[in-house]
């Protein structure tokens, strides 16, 4: 609304505040609508503030800061709705708008706790966009800005529980990116352990479901590292320690049972690797039951589909380790593949589904190697190379290189295990050829 009357401007801004407060309370309202409206509120308050830029009142300054935080928060809220779908014009447009508003706030030298927390939310969105684009350098830049902003907000308000929780969550997110994107285990472990320690201390102060779920996630991240390092005894100890904290919270509707199931799944896999098959079966089935229930409640949720597909692959690995019938194992893997294909229909460009599919093909290939089914093995290997080597060469995304070679090694080991020497040698040549192509294209050192 174009008006120069100050009372009218304030009345319009106040109306926008009241209307936005009502909108936020409406369930199922599109997050993008809330984000756009919050941007209008911020622009309105910004206009009033700029009219009195040389001598703004305390009220005008506070209203602008709160409006900026609401705009940042609603941008991040809308961002969650469209996460994990690859590069997306809608998410970029909203985040770039918020980024411009952040530059404006910095120019005004307004740096209270709310403003700094708003900065942190926008930086996190920017980091995620760069992650989706495989822009590792900018991803880590914005990620560090996100972490620094949450730390600064905590410094400004050290007694606030939520501010401390957000800083711990930012450290945990830094660990995730070091681990899953950069492949730096050493830095990831430092971040995960620091975040987990903070979450445990916060949980002792206030046993709220939010902090419980944060603690579950940070514990799961540590468990993932222990699994990658093959430290299965330590993994089981960490899982038991974590699950003991949620024993009396399983019926709490706010407890993230998906995280509980993920920890059960990891423990089951570790027990399988320790050859404790009976106990492993119990934990794997516990996890599968939770994932099945989640998918029944949310039949169109791609994450629920991925979770169930992953546990089915785990169970297939378990049955392989026990020497079960190969046809039964393939049937389970095919069920998992059906779930991942449906997830890809929902989010075609999802990097997470693609990585899960690589894991599934790894399991499938091993079954065919044990069966000595050369035609099926060749077909599966071609699918695997399409998702890994060809993808890396086409996009120059190097984040999958480490995973690809680890899977190649597992194929070779499985062929040797089944006394299929000719196939083991052929797979070794395939791996060496992949290395050669990556070196020639300057995607890895020779």
Predicted regions located by residue number:
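Flexible helix-coil transition and linker loops at the boundaries of alpha-helical arrays
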Residues: 2-11, 28-34, 49-67, 84-88, ...
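"A position-specific structural signal for the A-helix of alpha-solenoid helical repeats
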Residues: 17-21, 44, 69, 73-76, ...
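Residue at a conserved register position within TPR or TPR-like alpha-solenoid repeats
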Residues: 78-81, 123, 130, 171, ...
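Residue-level detector of the short coil/turn that links helix A to helix B
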Residues: 134, 182-183, 230, 275, ...
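Fold-core signature of tandem repeat domains
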Residues: 167-168, 191, 195-198, 215-218, ...
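TPR/TPR-like (Sel1-like) alpha-helical repeat modules
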Residues: 382-389, 425-439
